[in-house]
């Protein structure tokens, strides 16, 4: 759906896997790098790119998006398939930050929230994960049961931003 200069589309991220490292996480980080070529993200950050991404998701939890997790990770982390639990969209366009400003209590200006930054936050009343993947592009994940509500809230905000001209 495109309204004004902003587009929202469903994002197929492939397999979504919650990884909760055991211990200090160093062995997990090495295993993740060896298995998938991805660094373990620091809090508030994401690593990788489309097709293979790792998002900080919470304290001692990351979300591997894309590949099926390598079996070697099971020795270093709790590995849980979350693929059917999340709805994922990409919000993009020159007014994307303005749309998010109407819905999310996070400063998404590019000087503050740079490419590769990620936040667990709220979109209105919905728990969400938002990651900046490009200059004007954001990956948004909400619980699957909230997919319709997310699209509705984004549409209302997109219409409001577009009406400003």
Predicted regions and their residues:
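Basic, glycine/lysine-rich polyanion-binding surfaces/domains
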Residues: 1-165
């Amino acid at each position: 759906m495109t309204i004004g200069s902003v587009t929202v589309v469903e994002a197929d991220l492939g397999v979504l896997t919650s990884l909760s490292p055991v211990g200090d996480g160093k062995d997990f980080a090495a295993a993740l790098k060896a298995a998938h070529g991805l660094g373990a993200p620091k809090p508030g950050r994401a690593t990788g790119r489309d097709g293979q991404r790792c998002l900080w998701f919470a304290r001692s939890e990351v979300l591997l998006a894309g590949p099926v997790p390598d079996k070697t990770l099971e020795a270093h982390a709790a590995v849980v398939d979350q693929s059917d639990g999340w709805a994922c969209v990409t919000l993009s366009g020159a007014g994307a930050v303005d749309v998010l400003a109407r819905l999310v209590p996070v400063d998404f200006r590019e000087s503050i929230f740079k490419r590769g930054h990620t936040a667990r936050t709220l979109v209105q009343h919905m728990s969400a994960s938002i990651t900046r993947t490009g200059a004007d592009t954001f990956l948004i994940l909400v619980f699957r049961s909230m997919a319709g509500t997310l699209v509705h809230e984004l549409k209302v905000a997109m219409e409001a931003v577009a009406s400003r001209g």
